[in-house]
Amino acid sequence: MSKRVVIFDTTLRDGEQSPGVSLNLHEKLEIAQQLARLGVDVIEAGFPIASPGDFEAVKAVAEQVRGPVICALARANRKDIERAAEALRGAEEARIHTFIATSPIHMQHKLRMEPDKVLDTAVDAVKLAKSFTSNVEFSAEDAFRSDVGFLCRIFSAAIEAGATTINIPDTVGYATPQEFGAFIKAIINGTPNIDKAIVSVHCHNDLGLAVANTLAALENGALQVEGTINGIGERAGNASLEEVIMALYTRKPFYNLETSINKSEIYRTSRLVSNLTGMLVQPNKAIVGKNAFAHESGIHQDGVLKERTTYEIMNPEMIGIFTNNIVLGKHSGRHAFRERLKELGYSLDDEKLTKAFARFKALADRKREITDEDLVVLVEDELRAFPEAYSLEYLHITSGTVLVPTATVRLRREEENFEEASCGDGPVDAAYKAIEKITGTGARLASYAISATTAGEDSQGEVSVKLEREGRFYTGRGVDTDIIVASAKAYLNAVNKIVFDGLPKAKTERAV
């Protein structure tokens, strides 16, 4: 009989530590709800002591998301643990994840503590966490560079104090698979009461080995995997959960392990995380990359057409990438639209369906054939609609080789229209300067990226931007068949998030 692997998602905590990523409460909740649909076992929602915003995010996820265990991170001290417990009060099932560093370099230079003091601190932390919840995880930070004998001692003491999960991180991504597998086995063999806890691993990707190390750990007795969607995280990121999950599924005869993941939600979850964080998925990324199921070689194409398994070890439909020969157009009705969305896995209420159908009709007037990719982009845009302080009413651009690029923009806020014109270094820059004149955010454009979401000369373009305002980053996304319009929508989407955060007030002297 196969053993079940616990999937612990830390996209909202470790993943959000990616440089330039800053999710607001609304976005964190959206990701958490999708992770619940994906079927992860544990959601690490944040680090409550880190900031009031982190506390509120963990609290909201704990109160509103049902299904997975909701986890909060805490250092091994009273203040952190009590704050985590407070944030988790509304959870259906809560877990406190407390940690302390155990490697000689960390104990000496960061903690300035002797090993015995570190052990005592860990035990006290676990006991305190246990007074708030029966579900307690203890992590030894920088475990792979720690002494195995000391790890066995501290893990044994933590389990005795009440820890139900023991986590073994490769914090700096230094391990190799053969080493890490042997390391896990040595800890399991050297910790007498290890059978009273689940052994977990948390691998970083500094050498590109996070997934390989995770799988090696599972081969050697670990039964919880910690990672993130798309492998995002600080530095080179974390183990990519979708890769671990599909490796276990595809190679089940080898690993004899299974998960409770709803695999058909993998692709949708990946897209959501990518869009909200602004971190684009590389085209050749395993499982969810744009080219993951693409075949350009004639020999490969011929083989796949004759028998898919000649060059594909999994079906794209398995992870939620659906293909269909039925093409919708401007003459397609509401019923056909709804039915196709259902086939793609989307169930919209009447209000959202009405809005999405109106957008579909508008797109069909500009685009001869509407593909599944178009529908996915359209419906996800509607499902993720962010509260709009400003909406784009009008955009006019003049540009060319002998013209000064100029943009005229009209935005609507509540019942008032605001219009401005500006010149710039190209049409996009001109549009952004005009929007900035109206909104007055004072934000800096930190990044700008374009990708084609669908194929063909009338394809939709997707623009992703990041605005930086007082050290915080705001991601915006816009989609349109006109890339300049998509660019304006993306910038405005990020501006609305700044306004949603309460800064700054809009200028009103230009009402028209």
Swiss-Prot record:
Mn(2+) binds at D14, H202, H204, N238. Its EC number is 2.3.3.13. GO terms for molecular function: 2-isopropylmalate synthase activity; acetyl-CoA C-acetyltransferase activity; manganese ion binding. Its cofactor is Mn(2+). GO terms for cellular component: cytoplasm. Residues 391-512 are annotated as: Regulatory domain. Its main location: cytoplasm. It catalyses: 3-methyl-2-oxobutanoate + acetyl-CoA + H2O = (2S)-2-isopropylmalate + CoA + H(+). It comes from the Bacteria. Belongs to the alpha-IPM synthase/homocitrate synthase family. LeuA type 1 subfamily. NCBIfam families: leuA_bact, PRK00915.1-2, PRK00915.1-3, PRK00915.1-4, PRK00915.1-5. Catalyzes the condensation of the acetyl group of acetyl-CoA with 3-methyl-2-oxobutanoate (2-ketoisovalerate) to form 3-carboxy-3-hydroxy-4-methylpentanoate (2-isopropylmalate). This is 2-isopropylmalate synthase. It comes from Heliobacterium modesticaldum (strain ATCC 51547 / Ice1).
